[in-house]
Amino acid sequence: MIKSFGNKETEKIWDGIQSKKLPADIQNVARRKLRMINNSQNINDLRIPPANHLEKLSGNLIGYYNIRINKQWRIIFKWENDNALDVEIVDYH
């Protein structure tokens, strides 16, 4: 379950509100991926579908995971006690 968001724009997408700061063409896919995160019982649930490309991050994002929206955009989040924290849509490039 999603417990917190990393920024207001991601929370807007979750709430079904269009964001002017994020590309319109990713918003529906991002909302669907946010629902997947919210409905996950554990982190391994996000390995399916394989198109999510679930990854554990390193470097300055150690402790975070990400799934892909598309080639450019990702949803990053922390996973603790079967909950997603600091969920945020980011431009990965």
Label the model's feature ranges:
Residues 1-69, 80-93:
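Basic, Lys/Arg-enriched alpha-helical interface segments
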